[in-house]
Amino acid sequence: MRYPAIDLADAVVLVTGGARGIGLATGEAFAAAGATVCLGDLDGALAVEAATSLGGYGGGVDVTDRDSFASFAGAVRDRYGRIDVLVNNAGVMPLGGFLDEADTISRTTLEVNVWGPIHGMRLVLPEMIARGRGHVVNICSMAGKLPIPGMAVYNASKFAAVGLTAAVRRECDRTGVSVSAVLPSAVRTGLASGVPLGRGLPTVDPEAVARAVVRSCRTRRAEIPVPGYLAGWDLIAAVTPEPLLRLGRRLVGDDRGLTQLDPAARAPYEDRVAAQAAARKQT
């Protein structure tokens, strides 16, 4: 399907989780293309600082809270009149054994990684559809295609996000609005702190993911793996005999989130997620 073109030099882009990592890199990439960048993040002060450096708008947003998301999206509309591109990037990735993970952490993972995109799309898609143009990018993960030991609930959240994106894309057929899933492999950000990367595990920098997000505004592809050579890997896995697949996974070390984790290096990130979970439990 052909979609109305989005002129990035005149576009208003909203990025959640925009204060660091993939979100910040995405904001920088859109700003370099001439777009007006609006960064929302649970750390509102950091989002304001980052957005100001890009000549845009920043503020606090809790993507699990529809009212908070609506308030930030409304502030963007009040300031710029519309939202042309929404990037649902905010996410959390706790690591550890499934049976060891606290329910509060599991709920937070699902609320951020699944309900965040749900809230974002329900708040922004109606205005895009009314205008007959717009683009939504959900930052999913290759973990939404392939199960990985040590991140069972994160896996579940990303499988859900991939399916959600595909279904909403179909519902938006013939509206002029596109919905894409970007599926990074391991990314060198705080989410992966304490995990040994590389050594057979496809690993990219956040800037590579950001470039894929910006390109999606032109290509409007349904799914964009990063790196690109991972396209179709889920289909290969589906037809590979399980013993051979298990051997390959073991050689790559797909369980390194369980067996090779550096607890001290990982602790600051896990503590931040735990604090978010505790705060939500009190509300």
Task: Report residues per predicted region.
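Residue(s) in the substrate-gating loop at a strand-loop-helix junction
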Residues: 141
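Active-site helix of classical SDR
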Residues: 121, 157
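The beta1-alpha1 cofactor-binding region of Rossmann-like NAD(H)/NADP(H)-dependent oxidoreductases
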Residues: 44-45, 60-71, 103
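C-terminal helical subdomain
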Residues: 181, 197-234
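Substrate-binding pocket helix/loop in short-chain dehydrogenase/reductase
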Residues: 97-107
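Canonical Rossmann dinucleotide-binding motif of NAD(H)/NADP(H)-dependent dehydrogenases/reductases
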Residues: 3-37
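Active-site loop immediately N-terminal to the catalytic Tyr-X3-Lys motif
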Residues: 99, 148-152
